[in-house]
Amino acid sequence: MSKYAKIKKQAYEGNIQLPKLGLVLFTFGNVSVADHESGVFAIKPSGVAYDELSPEKMVVVDFEGNVIKGDLRPSSDTKTHAVLYRNCSKMGSIVHTHSTYATAWAQSLRDIPNYGTTHADHAIADIPCAPPMDDKMIEGNYEYETGFQIINCLKERHLSYEELEMILVGSHAPFAWGKSMEKAVYNAAVLEELARIAFITEQINPSVARMKASLVNKHFERKHGKSAYYGQ
C-alpha cells in the first residue's frame, strides 16, 4: 500500500461529497487533505468529473506545489492550497467551491454579516470577503497570490484560521477548511447555508441589524468555548 493511500482516500471521499451536498456543478471545486508530517497533500485532478474520480486519481503534491505522485495534473487551485498548508500547520483539509450563494456574496465583494444564532454557532465574526487582488498579482503567480489573499485578510481582521474556518475571496468564490476532511466539507456546506440565510434575511428586512454581541458570544462560546456544553 502506498504511504499516501490514506490522504488520497480521504481526498477522494471529500470530493465526491461536494456534488451530493449541492455545493458544485460539473468540476467546479476541489477538496485536498494534508499530511503535515510528510509535507504533502492529496488533491483532486484538474477538470475531472466527480463521477470519474477514484482514490488512485488523486494527485499528491508537496507544500511548494510540486507533484510528488500522480499521473494527472492537479487542480488549478493547487498553489492556493499549498500556500495555506505551508502557513497553517493545523489546517488538515481545504475545500474550494463555487457554491451559489457564497459565490454571489464573493462577487458582491461583501462580508456575510452575522445576523443570527445559526451564524454565531459557527463563526464569531462576519465571514470576511478578501478584497480582489491588484493587476500585478493577477498577472503574476495568480493561484499562489490567492493563498496570500486569504492569509492577509485574516491577519488584517485579527482573525485566527483555527477559530474562523471559512472565507470568501472577492470576485472569486469561497474557501473553507478544518482539522479533518469531514470538518472542512462540513464548513463548506455551512458557509453556503449561512450565505443563503443572510441573503434571504436582507430580502425580508433590508434594514436588518447585526445580532448583538452578547448573543453572538453566547452562541459561539457554548459550542466552541472552554466551557462549551453543546453536544455529547
Language-model regions: role of each:
Residues 1-232:
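Glycine-rich flexible loops
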